């Protein structure tokens, strides 16, 4: 009887591993993937910038409402449209790109409604600090790309972070906000 239970358990576990191994793998298309941030500048105007050379991988199984994602953002890819401002944000005052050249997001749980993701919980690592973040989905879909001749899935996501949780306290003591709004546009191509 014990042997039968162990055999059954082994078969069930094998099926679970097999289905996880068959998740469709997608690579992010960096021409359609970016992360843009907005931060209030002393209650006068809003500073904008973004990262445009994002790479990563998505494992997606919509029928099982399951997905995994890992995204890497090189700090060197920062672009505000003003070189001097880019260099200041990359400096040790703010992101310290020399010491921490990458920002990484790794999903921990996807939440679905009607087979579409509505939010993604994950861990954001920035300046050597890892904290939980939730991305809210504002749009998501998949289509057959006429360019890649493959399925592409992607969407728009938003979140808000307190930058001081990652050691980003530059000018907070002088009244600049801690809150950073982040908008992400992402598309990934099935491999």
Label each residue range with its predicted role.
Residues 1-11:
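Bacterial N-terminal signal peptides that target proteins for export
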Residues 2, 20-23:
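Hydrophobic membrane-targeting and insertion signals
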Residues 10-18:
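Bacterial N-terminal signal peptides
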Residues 22-191:
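Low-complexity, acidic/polar, glycine-enriched regions of mature
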């Amino acid at each position: 009887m014990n042997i039968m239970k162990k055999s059954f358990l082994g078969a069930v576990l094998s099926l679970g591993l097999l289905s996880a191994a068959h998740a469709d793998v997608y690579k992010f298309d960096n021409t359609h993937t970016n992360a843009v941030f907005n931060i209030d500048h002393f209650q006068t105007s809003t500073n904008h910038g973004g990262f445009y050379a994002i790479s990563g991988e998505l494992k997606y199984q919509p029928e099982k409402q399951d997905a995994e994602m890992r995204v890497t953002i090189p700090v060197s890819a920062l672009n505000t449209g003003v070189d001097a401002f880019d260099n200041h944000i990359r400096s040790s005052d703010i992101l310290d790109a020399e010491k921490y050249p990458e920002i990484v997001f790794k999903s921990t749980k996807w939440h679905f409604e009607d087979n579409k993701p509505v939010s993604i919980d994950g861990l954001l690592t920035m300046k050597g600090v890892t904290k939980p973040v939730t991305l809210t989905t504002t749009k998501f879909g998949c289509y057959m790309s006429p360019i890649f001749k493959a399925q592409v899935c992607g969407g728009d996501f938003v979140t808000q972070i307190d930058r001081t949780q990652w050691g980003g306290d530059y000018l907070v003591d002088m009244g600049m906000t801690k809150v950073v709004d982040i908008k992400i546009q992402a598309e990934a191509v099935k491999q």
